[in-house]
Amino acid sequence: MSTAIEVTPSDLENKTFLDSNELVLNMGPQHPSTHGVLRVILKLDGERVLGTECVIGYLHRGVEKIAENRTYVQFNPYVDRMDYVAAVSNGLGYCEAVEKLIDVQAPPRAQFLRVILTELNRLASHMVWLGTHALDIGALTPLFYTFRDREEVLKIFEKYCGARLTTHAFRIGGCIYEAYEGFEKDVLDYCDKLGPRIDEYEGLLTGNRIWLQRTKGIGILNAADCKALGVTGPVLRAAGVKWDLRKAQPYAAYDQVDFDVPTGENGDTFDRYMVRMQEMRQSIRILRQAVEKLPAGPTMAKVPKVLKPPVGRIYHSIEAPKGELGYFIVSDGSLQPYRVRVRPPSFVNLQALDKMVRGALIADVVAVIGTLDIVLGEVDR
């Protein structure tokens, strides 16, 4: 008896037989190009992506539940551990949300210090994105340049508050640390250096034939889909939507500085790259103005040592490097929040991955994940 399977010409026309070309492939959770412990289940037909499913939660630490068992002040350092690449932005969003809840406003000097530190952090975050995104696609050199320049931002943070990554730079009511001697000079010197270096980054990538082939027309997400999925940040602006919370709903001292909101046209990987490159230039522009306008005065408002906000609820959001970062806080009048709900941009933007890679090649999945600029500490919380 023969055990061989005979295939007839009619079998080749049978749909069920052709379906055997479909393959389910697990990408991650231990994969260098998922930028964390993300598992992506890919359904493939050859090298074409038919669909994806993201499996998250490998880095879940229960941050929102921890908030219910800490005082408002005690929970402040925890938010730095979500998007640990942009810890300063996390702290700013949380502190401003609690300040709204207790009806306290940070002094003008603190507002400008917050803008300076947050924009430095935006630059550092975008440089991590650029270096790793380029590396994913096969360009090694930009990684060394971007991490070299990011190091100078981390040194400024270290001199300001003693920490480099999870800075805990802000407090409810303002900034606990005064600017160190030479702070303004360090920031302006860095701005002078970084402008030409951004031109160097673009010289390596923007006109590169391989870079263009790997990014142009890849991972398209149009404006309508962005709005339907709740996507924000550079991903939304790359689709042509001019929405930036620093302009639309100004906070801190952003209403006192002038800057543009870069947008794209096609909503593809290349446009998302270009939007972030232009954002870095705008951050330099904001930093120069903020240093020039930095007023004298106290950096902390008068805030009770024991915070006991009145019964109520508040939602406050800021423009983090990756998009809209929001905090919904419910107070029951006790020392601890009744509920803290975080709206992390990485979590929301990741939902768009399936829409962006359907019909693309498997090699393009890595490029699209990189251009979303997700951090799994923020996705999983």
Swiss-Prot record:
Enzyme Commission number(s): 7.1.1.-
Short name of any one Pfam family annotated for the protein: Complex1_49kDa
InterPro entries recorded: NADH_Q_OxRdtase_suD, NADH_UbQ_OxRdtase_49kDa_CS, NDH1_su_D/H, NiFe-Hase_large
Compartmental location: Cell inner membrane
Keywords on record: Cell inner membrane, Cell membrane, Membrane, NAD, Quinone, Translocase, Transport, Ubiquinone
UniProt keyword annotation of Secreted present: no
GO cellular component: plasma membrane
Main location: membrane
Membrane topology type: Peripheral membrane protein
GO terms for MF: NAD binding; NADH:ubiquinone reductase (non-electrogenic) activity; quinone binding
Top-rank EC class of the record's enzyme: translocase
Record field: catalytic activity: a quinone + NADH + 5 H(+)(in) = a quinol + NAD(+) + 4 H(+)(out)
Highest taxon of source: Bacteria
NCBIfam families xrefs: PRK06075.1
Assembly and binders: NDH-1 is composed of 14 different subunits. Subunits NuoB, C, D, E, F, and G constitute the peripheral sector of the complex.
Family designation: Belongs to the complex I 49 kDa subunit family.
Protein name per UniProt: NADH-quinone oxidoreductase subunit D 1
Organism of derivation: Koribacter versatilis (strain Ellin345)
Lineage per the UniProt record: Bacteria, Pseudomonadati, Acidobacteriota, Terriglobia, Terriglobales
